[in-house]
Amino acid sequence: MNSEQVTLVGQVFESYVSEYHKNDILLILKERDEDAHYPVVVNAMSLFETNMEIGDYFTVFPNEVLTVFDSALRRSALAILQSLPETEGLSMKQNLHARISGLPVCPELVREHIPKTKDVGHFLSVTGTVIRTSLVKVLEFERDYMCNKCKHVFMVEADFEQYYTFSRPSSCPSLASCDSSKFSCLSDLSSSPARCRDYQEIKIQEQVQRLSVGSIPRSMKVILEDDLVDSCKSGDDLTIYGVVMQRWKPFQRDVRCEVEIVLKANYVQVNNEQSSGMVMDEDTRKEFEDFWEHYKSDPFAGRNEILASLCPQVFGMYLVKLAVAMVLAGGIQRTDAAGTRVRGESHLLLVGDPGTGKSQFLKYAAKITPRSVLTTGIGSTSAGLTVTAVKDSGEWNLEAGALVLADAGLCCIDEFNSLKEHDRTSIHEAMEQQTISVAKAGLVCKLNTRTTILAATNPKGQYDPKESVSVNIALGSPLLSRFDLVLVLLDTRNEDWDRIISSFILENKGYPSKSENLWSMEKMKTYFCLIRNLHPTLSEVSNQVLLRYYQMQRQSDSRNAARTTIRLLESLIRLAEAHARLMFRSAVTLEDAVTAVSVMESSMQGGALLGGVNALHTSFPENPRAQYQRQCELILEKLELQGLLQEELRRLERLQNESVHQCQSHSLEEEVAPGSCRNDPRDKPRLRTSTQQEQSCSWSSTERSGADSPPGPGLNRPTSCNNSAENRDGRGDGLDWLDPTSSPEIAPESTIVSPNVKTTEKNVNLKISNNKSQGKEKHGPQQRSKLLEAGHLPSSGAMNAPLRSHGVKRTKASQAVVVSEAGRGDEEDSVPRRLPKLLKEGSQNVCRSTTRVRPLPPTVPLSLSIPSPGSGKRSGTPKRKRRKSAQVEEPEPEGMETPTVKLAKFTFKQKTKLTHSPEGQGPIPPSASEIAVDSSKIPQQRTRREAAVPVVAPGKSTSTSGDRCSDQLHGKTKELSRQPPDSNPPREEREQGPKRRVIQPKPELGNQAGHSHLACEKDRKEGVSCGNKSSKVHAGTIARLASFSFTSPSESKSESLPPERKDSRDSRDSRDSRDRCHSPPATTAPVLGQQRQTFQLQQPTERANLSTLSLFTLSELDDEALDFDWEEEMRKKP
C-alpha cells in the first residue's frame, strides 16, 4: 500500500469509529490500567458499507490494513479524550486493538473447514473446536541493536514466519556509509515490558458433525496474542477471524525446511452459549407456537408427530423415540445456596440384541444436536474420553477427550460394554458431577463435561429377564445407577414382527419417498435448540406425583438398592422437566409427571408399580389422549391419588368434548366426509413414510376399554378420528399401553397400513358423499383409482349402491348396473392361471374328506364363550337393535348433524340391512367390488327351516359378521368378525352367490389374502354358487367344511365370543373354509383354534401375535358393513 492509500484507510476508519464506537472508547478511557490491551470489536459489514474501497484493501492487504486500523483507533481515542470538557478519571490508553468480526457470509471469507495453502495471506473466518491449549508465554517482539563501528542504534522486530526469531541485518542500516556487520544487542540483560506481549497457541479441529461419514477431521494451530490469550478453553466451539500465514524454522544445512500453515487470530468468538449456530428469530418461534396452538385440544397428538419425525427410518419403537426425545430436551441445571451444582442433563442407556436399531438412534441424535461427539467403546480409552496429556515441542499440554469436546452437548458412545473396566470408572465423575479433575504431567486442572450421554450396548450372551440388568450387560451398579433410563430392546424372534419390519424395509428400498407431514432434520434441530432455552417450573401437583412415586419405589420389596436412592428422584424431576420442554410448556404439569413416571416404569430402572416392558415392540398409539387417560388411571390409582385422578379425568373429558365439536364444525364448514378432524395428523394424505404408519396404523393395544371410558360423544362416534378405544379389554396391571406383544391377552385391533396412496382422502370422501354413502373412507384406494382410469370399473355410485349402511335406498336401476357388469368379471382377473386349477382340486379333496362338525364341547375355554369385560359392561341389547332404537328415540340437533347422521334417517325399503362395525372403526365402502343381492328369489322352504332355528337370548353382547368379498377385492387379508344371533348366513350365502361380481386388483408385495374370483370359479365348478341360481349346497358339506378355521390378524383375540347358533357358525365357517383354501397358510392365526378339531395350524402362544397384514395394503374393510339383518327380513314375511 502507498502512503495515499494508508491515509485514506486511516481517515475513513477514524471517522467510522468516532461515530459508531464512541461509547466503547469512553469505557476504555475510564479504565485504570494503562498498560493493558483493550479491544474494540468492529463489524465488517457496516464498515464496508461506509466505504467499499476499504473492503478491497482489507481483502488484499489484511496485515497492513489491520496495523493502520490500530493507529487510527488510537488517534480517535485521543481526539475523543481532548473533546471532553472534563477529563477527570480518564486516561489515554496506547494498547488499543481493532477486532474485526461479522464478515460477509461467502465462500471466499467464511470457512467451515481448515484453510489450505491457497488461502495464505487472506483474512478468513474459520469455525472449529478447541482440542488443545498451551500455556501462556511471554513473547519479546522487539529488540534494539547497536552497530559496533558507527554506534548507530536501530530496532529489529521478530519475524512471525520464522517462529518469532530475530534476524540481524547483513549490514548496518545507518544512512552513513557504514558497512559493518557486527552488532551488539542492547536488551540482552533485561527486556522492557513494553516490548513483550502475551502469547498462546491453541489447536482447533474441524467440527465432526459438519463432516461427511468417513472423513477424518483436520486440525491447525491458532496464534493468540495480547487480549485474546486465555479467551477459550479445551472443548469450546470457536469462530476465529484472522489471517492465514505460513511459518518455518530457520534454515539449516542439509535439513529439509518444513512449512506450517497457522492462523494468526484477530478476534475469537466463543459459540458455547449459542452452540446451535442458528439465530432464533421471532418467525421461528411463532411457527412452533402456532403448531402447539393447533394441537391445543390434543397436545399428545402434536408430540407424537414430533416423535414420528425422530429417526424416521426406524419403524415403531414409540417408547425409545419418546425417551430419546426427552433426553435430548434435557432438564434444568440448578445450583443451590451452598454452591452445589445439580446436573440437568439426563443419561440414557439402550440395551438390546444386535439389529434392534440402537446405533440408528445414536447417529440421528448426534446429527440433530449442534454440539455432539459420536464414538465407540472399543476404540476409546479413558484418556480418549476424558483428557490426555500430550508433550509437544518440549512441554506438556492437555488435549481434550470426547466428553470434554461434547461439553453442553451430546456424547454418543456405541458398544458401551466394550470399554475396559478401568476406563469405565473414569467417567463416573463426568456423568454425575459434570466435571473432570486432571492431575497429569504436573498439570492439575478441572474441566467441564456438562454433556448428555447416550450409550448403547449389547447384553452379555442371551438376555435373561430373571437376572438384573447389571448381570446381563456386565456393568457395575455405580455406573449403571448414573443412567436415568435403561431401556431393554429384546429381539423375541416374533415371526409376524419380522414380516412387518421386512415389508417396511423393502417398501422404503423399492419406493423411496418423503412425507410432507414429517419434520425435516433442520426443523428438528431448530426445535430442540429452542426448547433447551425454556425453564419450566415444577407445579404442586407434579411434585405430589413424583414424591409419591419415589416413596413407593423406596418401599417396594423388589427395589434395587443401588438404584432407589435420591438419584431416582432427581431423575424423575429431570424427565418431567424434559417432557415439559418437549411439549413447549413453561410449567411442569400433571401430564409431564405421569409421562415421566410411565417412562421410568417401562425402564429397567423402574418397574416397582407395573413391571418393565420390552421397548422394541412398542408402537405409536392410535389415540394418544386415550393412552394418556389409561396411564393416569393405572399410575394414579397405584399411587393412591384418587383426587388428582378424578380431576384429571374431568379435564380430559372437557378437552375431548371441545375437540369433537371442533371436528363437527370443520366437517360442516368444508362439506367433507364426517370424521375428518383437522387437528389430527392421521387425516393428512398418507405417503410412504413411517410417520403415517406409526401414528395411525399401529397396533392399538394402547387404547382403553369401553367400560373405562367416560361417556363422551368422542369415544362412541363410529366416525371419530380412527378411535377404537371403546372396544379394548382393560387389563388390571402392566404396561399394556406400551407393549402390544407382551401378553397373549393383547392382540392387534388395527393393522399396519401401507401409506402407498395416490388418491387423497378428501377426494375419496367427496366421491362417497356424492353417492350418498354413509361409510367412511379412511384411505384412498389405489387399485380402484387405477381401474377407474383404465375404464374397467363402473361408476362409484354403482359400486357403492349395494353397500349403504343404515338403509339407503337402492333402486332397480342401480341393481341393473351391477348385474350388467357381471359378465365382465372374468376379464378383469390378473392372477396366474395355474392357481384356479390347484385350488379347485384342493377344495374337492377337502369336501370329500371332511366330516360333520361337532357341537361345542363342554371344555371350551371361557374366552370363547363368555363376553369380555369390556363388552360385558355394555348394554344388554344387541348393538344393531340399540342403534335402531337410538336413531328413533335420541335424534341429534339439526345444527350438529353430520352428513352421516342425516343419511342415517333415510327409511330402509329393501330387505337387506347394513350396520356399522361394533369394533369402533367406521365401515368402509369397498372401492373395487359390486355385490348385488336379489332377496325376492329366496326359496320359501329354506326360509321356513331357518325361521324355526331357536334364537339366542338377546342379553348377550354380540358382534356382527358380513360378506368377505369386499376385503378380497382390495387384495388384502380378510377381516373375520363374530356372527350375531339374529343373522342367517346360509341364506345370505346362497342369495348372494348368483349376484356377486368381483374384480380382483393385481396383488402387491406382501399381500396374503385369498383371491375372490378363484373362490367364485371354484364354487361355480362345484355347483355351489357363481352361475347357477337353482343349485343348492348340501347341508353336510357346509357342516364338514366348518372344520376349517380362519381369522384375520386385525381381529382382537382379547375379546371373547358370545354363544352362537349352530347354523350361523356352520355357514360362517363354510365361507371361511373356502376363503382359507385360497389363502397362504402363513397368514392364519389360531384365534378359533381351540374350538376346531382338525386342520389346526398352531396354538395361541404366550406372546400375542402381531399383525400379519402387509404394509402395502391400503385400507381395512369392515365385514360388518356387509352384514344383513335376516331376522328383520323374516319378521316382515307372513
Swiss-Prot record:
Q: Which residues carry this modification: Phosphoserine?
A: S754, S795
Q: Which domain of life is it from?
A: Eukaryota
* Gene Ontology MF annotations: ATP binding; ATP hydrolysis activity; chromatin binding; DNA binding; DNA helicase activity; enzyme binding; MutLbeta complex binding; MutSalpha complex binding
Q: Which gene encodes it?
A: Mcm9
UniProt biased composition (Basic and acidic residues): 964-977, 985-994, 1014-1023, 1052-1078
* Gene knockout outcome: Females are viable but are sterile due to defects in double-strand break repair during gametogenesis. Males are not sterile and produce spermatozoa, but in much reduced quantity. Female ovaries are completely devoid of oocytes, and testes show a severe early proliferation defect of germ cells, causing a retarded development of only a fraction of seminiferous tubules that produce then apparently normal spermatozoa.
**What does the annotation say about its assembly with partners?**
Component of the MCM8-MCM9 complex, which forms a hexamer composed of MCM8 and MCM9. Interacts with the DNA mismatch repair (MMR) complex composed at least of MSH2, MSH3, MSH6, PMS1 and MLH1. Interacts with MLH1; the interaction recruits MLH1 to chromatin. Interacts with MSH2; the interaction recruits MCM9 to chromatin. Interacts with MSH6. Interacts with the MRN complex composed of MRE11, RAD50 and NBN/NBS1; the interaction recruits the MRN complex to DNA damage sites. Interacts with RAD51; the interaction recruits RAD51 to DNA damage sites.
Task: Extract the PROSITE patterns matched here.
Answer: MCM_2 (PS50051)
The main location is: nucleus
Source taxonomy lineage?
Eukaryota, Metazoa, Chordata, Craniata, Vertebrata
Q: What is this protein called?
A: DNA helicase MCM9
